[in-house]
């Protein structure tokens, strides 16, 4: 049984759910889940949790994402990307330069509000926005706070008749729509715009050069070497503070017991999480401050129980 994180190089044309279903069939297990939706037309890093690792999906989903994006100035679309129908056009002047673009990109760094596109899976009143959009109904969309950690121009500006395009890289918080970011960039430059290409190059610490294609995963499955190529749960959680405990405490953790907060974690707040490890290096659980009992830690997830060892 595989227990870990598969780093998939998601191909264009598949939904994230399609990828999960294919891996379930490939590995003959239902315990498979992805860690952050990628639109069908977007390729790149898609971490897939398998086996016990499905318990840590939420902790990987929270990580920042990095994208390589292309924006086309000159016309906007219904979907904010290259798949939609044209909404507005405006010929692009050839005097737009790198300095203009870099100034706009730098202005986007930090926290800001973003309204998700109508063609998205965000739910309003229990229904996905794209379902409203396909029915020709526009609804009020909830604003969300996002963080642009870094953004930079990576190519020259290329002019194509009445349009222009350039590429940029962006590292952003979960839930950021790069399509919408492209539209914002266009607005700040004075032009209708859309995202014409997107690839996710990193998800947290996982990069594209670590990922495997479906063909490679199928070959690993046939040779019985999938486990050798998965990221262990312990590495996947290396962004969390680590607490190494004694074998005596480990037995309590396996049973989901409350633990006294050690001195080094006395400043933890309610939103903090720590990964609890055995002396031999196995991650047993994730703990957080007990909401009602000061000085105690409560298990958020028990990853390894005695029966599984």
From Swiss-Prot:
GO biological process, one term: tRNA pseudouridine synthesis
Principal EC category: isomerase
SUPFAM superfamilies tied to this protein: Pseudouridine synthase
Organism superkingdom: Bacteria
Reactions listed under catalytic activity: uridine(55) in tRNA = pseudouridine(55) in tRNA
Region forming the signal peptide: none
SS bond partners: none
Keyword field contains Protein transport: no
EC number: 5.4.99.25
GO MF: pseudouridine synthase activity; RNA binding; tRNA pseudouridine(55) synthase activity
This protein's UniProt keywords: Isomerase, tRNA processing
Positions annotated as active site in the UniProt record: 39 (nucleophile)
Family of the protein in this entry: Belongs to the pseudouridine synthase TruB family. Type 1 subfamily.
Function: Responsible for synthesis of pseudouridine from uracil-55 in the psi GC loop of transfer RNAs.
UniProt name for this protein: tRNA pseudouridine synthase B
